Amino acid sequence: MQAISLTPALVGVLRFLARNPGATQRELAEAIGMPPSRLVAMADELERRGLVHRVRDEQDRRSHRITLTAAGEAELAVIGREAREHKSELLKALSAEEQNQLADLLQRIAAQQGLRPGIHPGLSRPSSGERSELLRKR
């Protein structure tokens, strides 16, 4: 596995933008639960790295819309592969039933903490394909 050079918060921004292309900075800040002023610094960092592109909103010139660049999409794909490999390695000591129990418990904790799937990195149920892949590797 290669080292990922983005913080979990930056990965969360990329994940949100992959599902919501063209979201405004305000929409993004609300979705991930952070002040818009802090999000601007994160968007600046992602733009500096060439992972996102910001443009002024045509209807509201005070707003900026953010989209992933091709480099951002590629980085997110690499992060996804790395995360799946890491998860597979981490969970290989558990049976499929134990993995499901762990996922259920972690989902309950995440819900209690207000974390949202698709934004907070790693917060998602494994798909049936991922579960099958994990079982094949055992």
Descriptions of predicted regions:
Residues 6, 35, 72, 101, ...:
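Terminal low-complexity, poorly structured segments
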Residues 97-138:
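C-terminal regulatory/oligomerization modules of transcriptional regulators
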